Curated annotation (Swiss-Prot):
Residues 30-41 are cytoplasmic. PSII is composed of 1 copy each of membrane proteins PsbA, PsbB, PsbC, PsbD, PsbE, PsbF, PsbH, PsbI, PsbJ, PsbK, PsbL, PsbM, PsbT, PsbX, PsbY, PsbZ, Psb30/Ycf12, peripheral proteins PsbO, CyanoQ (PsbQ), PsbU, PsbV and a large number of cofactors. It forms dimeric complexes. Part of a photosystem II (PSII) assembly intermediate complex PSII-I; crystallized from a strain deleted of psbJ, it forms monomeric PSII before addition of the oxygen evolving complex. PSII-I includes 3 assembly factors not found in mature PSII (Psb27, Psb28 and Psb34). This is Photosystem II reaction center protein X. Keywords: Membrane, Photosynthesis, Photosystem II, Thylakoid, Transmembrane, Transmembrane helix. Involved in the binding and/or turnover of quinones at the Q(B) site of photosystem II (PSII). PSII is a light-driven water plastoquinone oxidoreductase, using light energy to abstract electrons from H(2)O, generating a proton gradient subsequently used for ATP formation. The gene is psbX. The chain crosses the membrane at residues 7-29. Gene3D superfamilies: Single helix bin. The lineage of its organism: Bacteria, Bacillati, Cyanobacteriota, Cyanophyceae, Acaryochloridales. It comes from Thermosynechococcus vestitus (strain NIES-2133 / IAM M-273 / BP-1).
Length: 41
């Protein structure tokens, strides 16, 4: 039973890391898209 808390924390860390990575990629893509639009104007 001592394994479950560490596993829970591990999964929470993985999830938060994935969310942070996803947000970072979304921001980078948005910035590049905005840059393209501004250059085409």
């Amino acid at each position: 039973m001592t394994i479950t808390p560490s596993l829970k924390g591990f999964f929470i860390g993985l999830l938060s890391g994935a969310v942070v990575l996803g947000l970072t990629f979304a921001v980078l893509i948005a910035i590049s898209q905005i840059d393209k639009v501004q250059r085409s104007l």
